[in-house]
Amino acid sequence: MSGPSRTQRPMSPLRAFFHHETSAGLVLMACALAAIAVANSPLAPGYFATLHAYAGPLSVQHWVNDGLMAVFFLLVGLEIKREILTGQLATWGKRTLPGVAAVGGMAIPGIVYVMLNLNNPDALRGWAIPAATDIAFALGVMSLLGSRVPSSLKIFLAALAIIDDLGAVIIIAIFYTANINVATLLGAVFVFGILRSLCAANFQDLRIYLALGAVLWVLLLVSGVHATLAGVLLALTIPITTASATPDPSRQTAPLHRLESLLHAPVAFAILPIFGFANAGVSFASITPAIMTDTLAVGVAAGLLIGKVVGIFGAVALMVRLRLAELPTHATWLQVLGVAFLCGIGFTMSLFIGLLAFEDPHMQDRVKYGILAGSLLAGVLGYGILRIAGRRAL
């Protein structure tokens, strides 16, 4: 039997990806509902006190949002790198349709939000909140439909969401970075340079990469750049090829694939559920009918529910009409519409951007109302449309 190729990866990575993402979506959904229930129960004071309690230099909530989510962004970065180099986004032809759809699905929600908040300057900083898609939630809902949805549509949704994640990372880096400490930022650049050099030399020891990644995280945290970006930067430096010759069987799989395989379960079943439980809790005790006219909450909900659909479905329709792309194999227009609605589930990344955009707890709560309402409606409508479309296809 011939030895492993230099780009060998674990068996069925796409199947493993869908398995983890769909299961993670269901677990995340349960934790989000649990957080809402606790926040509206007699346990609420203890819940919020625990989140705001300090453990060392950061509060518990900050450790979750800045620390654990850096690991989530590391996994996101690994998935983006893998898909661009060897996967569903490896050629421009494969990138075109989900790429254009992702751009439309980020731009139009932002425009919808801004239009509704033109007279509310304080709220404009949240323009990017409805631009995000939660791939775990979206694939989790899609998994409930089983064989009613063609696999090509699942791949399209995954590719679209991965590009969407890349866009969200860029937005966070550019628009949601605080005052910069130049000295520590230069230190972070130096560490990143070391990581790039190790990658260029195809250095295989993940322990060294992770140790330097931890140093990079600390430097970015102190510098004012959001520390979670350390995860993405580290991912860019993890080699995707194996050493030309290694007697160690554990090293016959590329470091990127080893690390991605190692992180999938902890991120899916620990980090994302913890994030959801720590951030989805919002009290409805003070909610009034006035929330229906609150442009911040309505802007987020409308961006997710209307902006995503118009942006994604419109972009796909334009590309197909201009004969620049074709619909995913065996997919119908009604199914594409259903996927566009599912992309309006913006939970994890939308919450994350909302917390970066606003420090005022009251504004954060209004953002959460909008995210919950928009994501719930988008998920229900997307599921319903795909279920109807699946019956027609049978």
Swiss-Prot record:
Database matches in InterPro entries: Na/H_antiporter_dom_sf, NhaA
GO biological process, one term: regulation of pH
UniProt keywords, alphabetically: Antiport, Cell inner membrane, Cell membrane, Ion transport, Membrane, Sodium, Sodium transport, Transmembrane, Transmembrane helix, Transport
GO CC entries: plasma membrane
Transmembrane segments: 24-44, 58-78, 96-116, 126-146, 155-175, 180-200, 214-234, 267-287, 300-320, 336-356, 370-390
Cleaved signal peptide residues: none
Recorded topology in the membrane: Multi-pass membrane protein
Record's catalysed reaction(s): Na(+)(in) + 2 H(+)(out) = Na(+)(out) + 2 H(+)(in)
Location(s), subcellular: Cell inner membrane
Single GO molecular function: sodium:proton antiporter activity
Function: Na(+)/H(+) antiporter that extrudes sodium in exchange for external protons.
PANTHER family (alphabetical): NA(+)_H(+) ANTIPORTER NHAA, SODIUM ION/PROTON ANTIPORTER NHAA-RELATED
Annotated family: Belongs to the NhaA Na(+)/H(+) (TC 2.A.33) antiporter family.
Protein name: Na(+)/H(+) antiporter NhaA
Biological source species: Azorhizobium caulinodans (strain ATCC 43989 / DSM 5975 / JCM 20966 / LMG 6465 / NBRC 14845 / NCIMB 13405 / ORS 571)
Upper classification of the organism: Bacteria, Pseudomonadati, Pseudomonadota, Alphaproteobacteria, Hyphomicrobiales
